[in-house]
Amino acid sequence: MPFRRDVAHASARPDPGGAPMLRRMSKKVPKNVLRSVHGTSRRQEYSASTKRALVDVAQELFTERGYAGTSLDEIVAGARVTKGALYHHFSGKQALFEAVFERVEDDASSSIRRAIKDVKDPWEKALTGLRAFLDVLQRPEYRRLVIQEGPAVLGYEKYREQEERSTYGIVQDIVSSVLATYDLEPSMVETFSRVFFGAMSAAGSAVSSAEDTARASAEVEAAIAFILAGLRQQSESGGKLPGPDDLRGEG
């Protein structure tokens, strides 16, 4: 074939250093090295798939039965792995729950970030972010694992740490955008962010514990939209937010 002849001729030409390119191309990686690399790759792939299967099954069972109602035996049986494989990846049931919690939180924050990504107006961004969060609250795994089970299983400190890692930054970004028209100290912006973050956490608890989660979500949206509308009206009319010194009575 002409193509092969061309390649052969090109390969036979000497390189600038004088050594034929064909000779350089003929050098092969030792077979034992290739076997080692391929073996390591297969082991890593198997290890990752085992861990993923454990988290998948644990998420399903924790959501359906709760943390206390789920045993490690059920998880390894569902994932079709041994307990030794589980302990290779996780120190125990709580560590596995934490991995599930992180996944659910990360999925939630990714959904909210996607929803607000292209929204330029800060007020519309706040409402869009709120609605995206309320949509997340309709997910059974989020309500059960993050809102209901998370604080008790992880403990308050770790729970807050995980929440701040995943969703606090979103709230902080939205609040900073909304308050950009006000001449506020950074500490006041941080305070507003904390207050709104607390309000969203409380809203999550209210919705997750409601019999009619759709109705509860609509009520939360109406309440927070009302607060945002007041802030927007004040901003557009040239008003300003009082600082801590403005609220103190004269002695």
Predicted regions and their residues:
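Short hydrophobic/aromatic patch on the recognition helix
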Residues: 80-90
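Alpha-helical DNA-contacting segments of helix-turn-helix folds
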Residues: 98-104
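Short helix-capping/turn signature of helix-turn-helix
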Residues: 90, 148-154, 198
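Amphipathic alpha-helical packing segments from all-alpha helical-bundle domains
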Residues: 106-109, 128, 147, 154-181, ...
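Hydrophobic alpha-helical connector segments
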Residues: 99, 113-141, 192, 196
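Basic, helix-initiating cap at the start of DNA-binding domains
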Residues: 2-65, 69-81, 94-98
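Amphipathic C-terminal alpha-helical segment
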Residues: 135-139, 172-173, 177, 193-214, ...
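Secondary-structure edge/capping motif, primarily at the C-terminal ends of alpha-helices
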Residues: 115, 144-147, 207-211
